[in-house]
Amino acid sequence: MIRRPRPRRLLTALATAAAVGPASPATVTAAAAPRPIYAPGTSVSQLQSTQVMVADRTSGTKGTWARYSWNGSRWVRVNANAAAVFGRGGVVPSAQRRQGTSTTPAGTFSLVHAFGVGNPGTRMPYRRVTRCSWWIQHPGQRDYNRWRESCSVPASVARSSERLQSYVDSGLYRQAVVIRYNYTTPNRSGAHSGAEIFLHYARSYTGGCVGIDSMSELTATVRWLDPARKPVIVVKA
């Protein structure tokens, strides 16, 4: 008996079927997008940050202080009892804040780094203050609103800047965190200007920073911060 050769098209189809296996209906189910759950009193959800601090002015230069941590299903308040302290000029929207007004900018801000007398155990980038550590506030300087490590700062620059060791000695900057206000591309004058907005210890008022009136709570806050969790501070007027 003479066998007839099979058509090449049929052979190709059979080979493909053998490789793929039996057909079955395809079912594709898209994963549901996580639902944003906002930290109390803020518009920050766990999709943006899992560490949120809230400083809410209630009257004068004082207000409430809270730290919230996302535990995977809900926000948990983790701070010790403490009050927030604000600039003696009050709290203003960050877009309206101007240098030299002693006002605290309101808004939601990320953080740059921590600093002080020694790392208390934080995962944040940390700088130790020395006798030659300055924070430059002179608008004419290239490193305006930046740390400068120099033992020979010109008098004209020093007059409008802060020698950080002086504030360490007074207890205010033993531990502190740089708040990312007017930092990335700083405005040197006009609206949304000003330098050196920190989180630090304070009792009654600040020059525009956010203060905590408990050194133990401040130290615990610095230790708690983890850049992998994208911490933010929410300042409310």
PLM features per residue range, with description:
Residues 1-32:
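Secretory targeting and sorting signals
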Residues 8, 212-215, 219:
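Conserved structured core elements
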Residues 33-197, 217-236:
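Cell wall/extracellular polymer interaction/catalysis modules
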Residues 99, 205-206:
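Alpha-helical hydrophobic/aromatic positions enriched in membrane-embedded helices and signal peptides
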Residues 107-108, 206-213:
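Active-site nucleophilic cysteine motif
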Residues 199-204:
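Immediate flanking context of iron-sulfur cluster ligation sites
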